[in-house]
Amino acid sequence: MPQLNPNPWLFIMLMSWLTFSLIIQPKLLPFTPINPPSNKTPTTTKTSPWTWPWT
């Protein structure tokens, strides 16, 4: 059972972290969101009470 052998764990975790931080992260950071947030004022709608026909 190779998962019980803890010898390569540190190396695998370090290589995973380096791969993410040096290769994947710079490729993901330049993307801009499709719908950027805008400064909209919240609109309040007037609610009317429900009519209860059985009272």
From Swiss-Prot:
Keyword field: ATP synthesis, CF(0), Hydrogen ion transport, Ion transport, Membrane, Mitochondrion, Transmembrane, Transmembrane helix, Transport
Topological relation to the membrane, as annotated: Single-pass membrane protein
Record's GO cellular component terms: mitochondrial membrane; proton-transporting ATP synthase complex
Secretion signal span: none
GO biological process, one term: proton motive force-driven ATP synthesis
Family under the similarity heading: Belongs to the ATPase protein 8 family.
Function in brief: Mitochondrial membrane ATP synthase (F(1)F(0) ATP synthase or Complex V) produces ATP from ADP in the presence of a proton gradient across the membrane which is generated by electron transport complexes of the respiratory chain. F-type ATPases consist of two structural domains, F(1) - containing the extramembraneous catalytic core and F(0) - containing the membrane proton channel, linked together by a central stalk and a peripheral stalk. During catalysis, ATP synthesis in the catalytic domain of F(1) is coupled via a rotary mechanism of the central stalk subunits to proton translocation.
Protein known as: ATP synthase protein 8
